[in-house]
Regions:
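Short, acidic, small-residue-rich periplasmic hinge/interaction motif at the N-terminus
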Residues: 29-33, 40-45, 71-77, 87-137, ...
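Short acidic/polar hinge/loop motifs at secondary-structure boundaries
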Residues: 60-62, 167, 186-214
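A beta-strand signature from Gram-negative outer-membrane beta-barrel systems
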Residues: 93-95, 201-246
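Transmembrane beta-barrel wall of Gram-negative outer-membrane proteins
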Residues: 242-244, 249-280, 285-323, 368-380, ...
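Acidic/polar loop-and-plug regions of large Gram-negative outer-membrane beta-barrel proteins
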Residues: 300, 308-372, 395-464, 528-549, ...
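Surface-exposed extracellular loop regions of Gram-negative outer-membrane beta-barrel proteins
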Residues: 327, 534-545, 588-609, 617, ...
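Gram-negative outer-membrane beta-barrel transporters
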Residues: 572-575, 694-696, 717-827, 917-919
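C-terminal beta-signal and adjacent terminal beta-strands/loops
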Residues: 741-742, 818-826, 854-920
Length: 920
């Protein structure tokens, strides 16, 4: 009997092991092109047990159910449900998806409840989506935000042209007013709301899906989605086994090598994904060399159908030379040829000892660690949580110091030029070491005593402005299905941020040391010989900060605590889907000034404004309310509407203005009200979407540094800025047949400032109040009503064609049009000219093109050849202007109707890249 029991136990164990090892495999392809779909989502219906397809469109999913239904969804394709039956513990499913539109129909990865991806003909928001395959094929040497330029109301530029220095505007709102999420985690800076794309230069390599929700968006969180939300979903650990190796080359020495591999999920539920890449070379602008590495590792564990966990770490340490300051059109022309501007010209560098040297250099490493947990409590309830941490370390370098000529005017290193427009570094160093220098009309005498010494006001040197941080947070979401059509979700959003802001010497340029008197708590003056490293630390757990003794000019830390509560009620039927969302948060701000002597007065003669080194936390509440509905009239027509109101806390520099530990006396939340109407039409081969929107934004705050009044450096703070952004958007796609497809979009906006705002001016040297020439007080009103919102094109259009002459070969061409592009708000001109109007930049057309050919071989392998050319016709155009100088009686010359004194960035000329990709 004992022996029989033994064998029965073994048999039972074997049967259980067999059941636990049941596997569903398959491939997901595009029905029309027959191309595999990377990142398609395969879900066992009724559960949260799902997986993403790999580069070959393959998936492998374990289950204990012999029968069931697979739900397959992917970007821009119709969701499909496929029944399966296991035979011998296995099933192989081949799925082809039909094109729907260029939008997302569903994304299911770990932490799905926190992604807030919009679904077509369901979520009532304006949305555009780019899939992983398009990102891989079209990125090349483009900047990540530029992949979105075919989206309505999006204006993306390379700005100065440095690696990762691009920026993006949506509906006229800049980076700080666009919420960017990675796997549901908000990445906007907690002090100023900005997104520094340099810190995320490698994110494109690990992105499986990117979705732009224009307007207030569908996110449940209290986030900065005034203009829109960019949702980024990264690679999942549980993609089936396989990988890819690729190499890309481009203009100006650009190169990129990448290797990625997925283990697939084993029988015990473990899976892993790893990616490594290196990018280097230079961009189109002169002396913009760079080197960036990227690493990604994800480890997944799904012990059963109820639980799924994934740990991810990714980072992109990099350094790059910049073209930071916009350059006058006059100088572009001066260093150009035959009356044409030198679009590559960069004024921020020169040769030092025969090697290139840039005053503007950016170095950063921002690793991010995330742990996601999905818990399927029952068929009607689920729980999702993500915890994250990041230790950002880095800086941007800049000029420091100056000389004084006989007239009392400051002469900066940037004024000492060679005949070809470069900074004369040899002359800079000779001056620092005691030699006199000649400038037009006079000689400037250097008197180092007893040795060459640099300060913030004399001598020439290079400094770094450190902007490092420690960032921790968590998000949690509970979702309960109340009935077949009604569901409710609620969650928490907690964050803590500590920002480190200070300056340190970077290169003494022949001086012996920097003499600093800024830290009032140390013996004065201090001799600082330390210089910061010019390359990033590769340690993802680096939490070091330079000691106070090595910090100069200023040193302040900003602490931000954030706690939010959010909820959503959603009703969905085949015809109607509607939602109501609310979120509330409390942000608490603290400022620590390491150089401040306790008791210093914020306002002269006002004892009640005495400051401490460390302020208490100032808590400010805020909230969001949103609602919307989509109605599917029939299979071809749908309409939607949404409305929302934000009461958003001011940014850190509005809470503690004027760079002081002095709380702003009248703190007011920014107020945003948005409303949107939309219509969609679709057939089997045609789809179009039309949107109308209006956003009112009140009580905005802006601070503008580095302004000049004659020979005095000052900065301005504007309070109470009001804006109206309204417009219309259209996007469409038409597939003629399997060989030809057209896509297009058009957007037109009217984005204007309203009424007056209050301006306050301060000296840059000591942050005291400053009265501008011609003014009687440091505080006065300025009229904004004649100005357009700048830095973004009010009108854009795009038309593209995709041609597939034969299987696996594709040609794409696109035309892009920009008009009603205005200069950014020129605060320096505004505070001096009450009748200022906006400078309109010339309209322009651009053409881009690309080809790709995929050669499959073996069972699972392929080689793909890629080539892309941007700005095919080498069009010369102005992408943005920092100044607002209109043509008037004092204008000496113009370029395309623009005063040549304006400081602008020209767009890149013709650029190209070619690539080779091997998938296995």
């Amino acid at each position: 009997m004992n022996r029989l029991n033994h064998w029965l136990s073994l048999l039972a164990f074997f049967m259980m092991a067999t059941l636990s090892a049941q596997t569903i495999t398959g491939t997901v392809i595009d029905e029309e092109t027959k191309e595999p779909l990377l990142g398609a989502n395969v879900l066992i219906k009724g559960t949260t047990h799902g997986i993403s397809t790999n580069e070959k469109g393959k998936f492998s999913l374990t289950t204990t159910d012999k029968k069931g239904i697979l739900q397959i969804s992917f970007i821009g394709f119709q969701t499909k449900e496929v029944p399966y039956t296991l035979v011998g513990g296995k099933a192989n499913i081949q799925v082809s998806l039909l094109l729907e539109t260029e939008e997302l129909t569903g994304v299911v990865v770990t932490g799905n409840a926190l992604l807030n991806m919009a679904k077509e003909r369901c979520t009532p928001v304006a949305v555009s989506t780019i899939g992983g395959a398009e990102i891989v094929n079209k990125l090349g040497n483009n900047e990540f935000p530029e992949l979105l330029k075919r989206t309505p109301s999006v204006y993306a530029t390379k700005s100065g042209g440095g690696y990762g220095d691009s920026k993006i505007n949506i509906r006229g709102f800049g980076n700080e007013n666009i919420a960017v999420m990675i796997n549901g985690m908000p990445i906007n800076d907690m002090e100023n709301g900005k997104v520094y794309w340099t810190n995320w230069a490698g994110i494109a390599d690990v992105t499986s899906t990117m979705q732009v929700q224009r307007g207030l968006g569908a996110s449940k969180l209290a986030i900065a989605s005034v203009g829109g939300t960019i949702n980024i979903a990264t690679r999942a650990a549980d993609m089936p086994e396989g990988g890819r190796i690729s190499a890309t080359y481009g203009n100006d020495g650009f190169y990129k090598g990448l290797a990625a591999y997925n283990t697939g999920k084993n029988k015990k539920g473990w899976s892993a994904s790893v990616l490594l890449s290196r990018t280097g070379g230079a961009t189109y602008a002169d002396n913009t060399q760079f080197l960036g590495d990227n690493y990604f590792f994800a480890l997944g564990y799904s012990p059963n159908d109820k639980h799924a966990l994934q740990f991810m770490i990714t980072g992109a340490p990099q350094w790059h030379n910049q073209r930071y300051y916009a350059i006058s059109i006059r100088d572009y022309l001066r260093y150009g040829k035959d009356g044409e501007p030198n679009r590559r010209y960069n004024a921020d560098w020169g040769y030092k000892n025969g090697e290139s040297f840039s005053f503007r250099r950016n170095t950063y490493h921002k690793p991010v660690m995330m742990l996601n947990w999905d818990w399927n409590l029952s068929e009607s309830s689920s729980f999702s949580t993500v915890a994250y941490a990041s230790f950002g370390r880095g800086y941007g370098s800049n000029y420091m110091g100056n000389a004084i000529d006989s007239n009392g005017n400051r002469v900066y290193a940037s004024h000492l030029r060679t005949p070809d427009g470069l900074i004369d570094m040899d002359r800079v160093i000779r001056y620092n070491r005691g030699e006199d220098i000649s400038v037009p009309g006079q000689t400037i005498v250097r008197k180092p005593s007893p040795v060459a010494v640099a300060t913030s006001r004399s001598g020439f040197s290079r400094k770094v402005s450190v902007n490092s941080h420690n960032w921790f947070g968590f998000l949690t979401n509970f979702e309960q299905k109340l009935s077949e059509n009604l569901s409710f979700s609620v969650g928490l959003d907690g964050r803590y941020y500590k920002g480190y802001h200070y300056e340190a010497p970077s290169d003494l340029l022949g001086n012996e040391y920097v003499l600093d008197r800024s830290n009032k708590n140390l013996t004065q003056p201090r001799r600082v010989t330390y210089t910061a490293a010019d390359k990033p630390s590769y340690n993802p757990f680096n939490t070091s900060i330079d000691p106070l003794e090595d910090q100069i000019n200023y040193s302040n830390y900003g602490n931000v605590r954030w706690m939010g509560l959010f909820g959503q009620l959603e009703y969905t039927t085949e015809k109607l889907s509607a939602f109501a969302q609310w979120s509330s948060s409390v942000q608490a701000f603290q400022r620590i000034d390491n150089f401040l002597r306790p008791g210093t007065l914020a306002l002269a003669g006002r004892p009640e404004t005495a400051m401490d080194k460390e302020t208490s936390y100032k808590g400010i509440p805020g909230y969001n309310i949103k609602a919307g509905a989509n109605y599917n009239i029939n299979n071809h027509h749908n309409v939607f509407a949404n409305v929302g109101y934000y009461s958003r806390q001011p940014f850190f520099d509005a809470v503690y203005p004027n760079y002081k530990n002095f709380l702003a006396p009248n703190l007011i939340n920014e107020k945003i009200f948005g409303i949107e109407l939309g219509y969609g039409f679709k057939t089997n081969n045609f789809a179009a979407n039309l949107n109308l929107y209006r956003t009112a934004w009140d009580d905005r705050h802006i601070r503008k540094d580095d302004q000049w009044d004659n020979n005095t450096n000052y900065f301005v703070e504007l309070f109470g800025i009001d804006e109206i952004h309204q417009g219309v958007e259209l996007d469409a796609s038409y597939r003629v047949n399997n060989y030809l497809k057209f896509v297009g979009m058009f957007s037109a906006g009217d984005w204007t400032y309203q009424g007056d705002a209050q301006a306050n001016t301060f000296l840059a040297a000591d942050n005291t109040e400053y009265i501008l020439t011609g003014k009687t007080t440091p505080s006065f009103d300025v009229d904004l009503s004649k100005l357009k919102v700048g830095e973004s094109a009010h009108m854009t259009a795009n038309l593209g064609v995709d041609i597939t002459p034969f299987e696996n070969f594709n040609i794409d061409l696109s035309w892009h049009y920009v008009d009603n592009l205005y200069a950014k708000l020129d605060i320096s001109a505004l505070v001096k000219n009450p009748n200022l109007t906006s400078l309109k930049l010339p309209a322009y057309h651009l053409f881009d093109g690309g080809i790709s050919y995929k050669y499959p071989f073996g069972k699972t392998q392929s080689i793909t050849l890629l080539a892309n050319v941007n700005n095919l016709l080498d069009t010369t155009y102005i992408a943005e202007s920092d100044t607002n100088n209109l043509v008037n009686g004092g204008t000496t010359a113009t370029y395309k109707g623009i005063d040549v004194s304006n400081r602008v960035f020209f767009g890149f000329g013709r650029t190209w890249n070619v690539g080779l990709k091997y998938q296995f």
